A protein has these predicted regions:
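Bacterial N-terminal signal peptides
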Residues: 1-3
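N-terminal amphipathic, basic helical "cap/leader" segment at the start of enzyme domains
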Residues: 6-119
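Small-aliphatic-rich amphipathic alpha-helix that forms the alpha element of a beta-alpha
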Residues: 32, 51, 79, 121-132, ...
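Short, surface-exposed helix-loop/turn micro-motifs enriched in polar/charged residues
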Residues: 71, 167-170, 186
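Short, flexible beta-strand-to-coil junctions
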Residues: 83-85, 128-129, 196
């Protein structure tokens, strides 16, 4: 999977996600919009934890099932958290971040759209095709992965709306550079990414 040369102490145990937000689903839908400007302000780990849990965290611990629908419950989606201090792989089982690179890869995630590198956090949504049945065709794996990524992306959008964060989902990125740095082969499809940050005027 990903390169794991970073030390164990670089891993981050996230706070418990907050699920008591007073914003209703309908309000989050009403307020959802794509924004390409972000304040120069870090996202605290408690807020990040809530966004990641909403994206594809475990909401039924007894069954190990997640907040986002998943084709044949493959749970193929991986989320990489890309920040100035490095890149981390979200671990839903224990709500933690595993450091996989010490490099700031936000420019690679931004690709040709430089505004994206100004966000304090980018979430890279990847489909691990190894999770799907071997007998599935490549076309089926791609379709399932893209659909699953879409579910997760919408969860990110709604969580950011409820938490007062700006975000925008994008497909543009330097896929080759990211795969090389993260140690991902062709069984991993880098589907999309989302920038998140506080509004610039706050």
């Amino acid at each position: 999977m990903a390169a794991t040369s970073c030390k164990a102490q670089d891993n981050v145990q996230l706070p418990k996600p907050s699920i008591d937000n007073q914003v209703t689903l309908m309000q989050a839908l009403q307020n959802r919009h794509s924004t390409r400007e972000y304040a120069d302000k870090e996202i605290p780990n408690d807020v990040l934890s809530t966004v990641l849990w909403a994206a594809c965290g475990i909401n039924r611990p007894g069954e190990g099932k997640i907040t986002a629908p998943s084709a044949i419950n493959a749970q193929d989606i991986l989320i990489y958290v890309v920040r100035q201090d490095g890149t981390y792989l979200y671990q839903p089982k224990d709500n933690s971040l595993q450091k996989v690179s010490s490099k700031d890869l936000r420019t690679a995630v931004a690709g040709r759209q430089s505004f994206a590198s100004s966000a304090p956090v980018s979430l890279l949504v990847v489909s691990n095709h190894n999770k799907f049945p071997q007998q599935s065709s490549n076309e089926a794996k791609v379709r399932m992965g893209v659909v699953d990524a879409g579910y997760v992306s919408e969860n990110i959008c709604l969580a950011c709306s409820a938490l007062g964060l700006n975000t925008v989902p994008r497909m543009t990125m330097d896929t080759e550079a990211l795969k090389k740095e993260l140690g991902l082969d062709d069984n991993y499809d880098l589907v999309l990414n989302s920038q998140i940050g506080y509004p610039k005027n706050k």
